[in-house]
Amino acid sequence: MTSVDINNNNNNNNNSNSNIIETKLIGHKDTVLCISSHNKKEIIASGSDDCTVRIWDLNTNKSIQSIVEGFQGNPVNNVCFDQDFTLYCSYDNIIVSFDLRQPNVILKEFNTQYKFNTEEINQLSFDSKYQYLAACDDSGQTKIIDVTKNKLVESLNKKHTNIATGCVFRPNSKNELITSSMDFSIIHWDFLKAKVLHRDTFKEGSLPQNISKSQQQQQETTEPNRMLNPPFVTSVDCSNNSKYVAISMGDGTIVINEISSFKQYLKINSIHKSSIQQVHYPKYLENNYQRLISFGNYDKKIVIWDVSEDMNTKVSSSLLSNDEKNNERIKTWLEHSEKINCLTTSNLKNNAIFVADLSNDLKLLSIQ
């Protein structure tokens, strides 16, 4: 474990408008792909390209358990805690669970295995009661699993026409789920009936013809106002008051909808110089609907936005340009040293962001 004060380290590539302390959680032997925080215990889990999972103690920032078998030599793409002692992990199209009460430091045997998805799983998500586990995949489908009965209860299919990038349950609702897709849409479901309650489709942009991936990446970095990606939806997250869903898109835009009406609450034409990889409501805030975290795909910039009603009133009544309005909304920003895979927060650790990037080390960013 090493700590760095980003603002005072001349050899670090990070830039920030706040004092950020970076702590490295060292243990994985390859790129960290995913992270999950426990809602009741001061632990987090991380999955890696090294085909293992590690459990970390937030008090010491050290690994206390590792799962080294059960993934058939595959990278672990998703991890998700239940409310007690079980960790669910996915690799390829398979989900396996592990009982963390085992006294062993190294775990090798899983408890349950689910093979309901047909293609690679992109996100795992629990409902508020931790009865239903959602798993969305590359086929565009989302499987709903009742983990108390170990059975598939519903398949949400034939509505998304491309990769399903995200799935999140509406907090404290009985049967509501929101999914996102590369088909430029998000869907609000009654997941127990496989019924579409709302759908929002974002206008498809146009891509230049005959452009290579490297050219696209370079142009995203050097020409922030010329987005080459269409607005495919890359992620979704719900606020803890159950009122809002935040949406990140490939054209660098953030949209927040009111869930009940599915009408647009606000739109941010982002300062990110690339597509936005993820949006996340910080779990450490009691009223987290007032703040939103985002990061870009290639620009490596992490931004904490003020999306409160007071700020909306302020910027909507001003004569500022879009860029100036964005600057008004920004509470904290930093440029990370590596391309980021994902991030999360914990309701048990204030002002802290956990970042999985292309390095082997999990990063804890403490905002001072």
Swiss-Prot record:
SUPFAM superfamilies: WD40 repeat-like (SSF50978). It holds the Pfam family WD40. Residues 207-231 are annotated as: Disordered. It comes from the Eukaryota. The keyword Repeat applies. Keywords: Repeat, WD repeat. Coiled coil: none annotated. The keyword rRNA processing does not apply. WD repeats lie at residues 27-66, 71-108, 116-155, 159-199, 228-267, 271-315. Belongs to the WD repeat WDR53 family. This is WD repeat-containing protein 53 homolog.
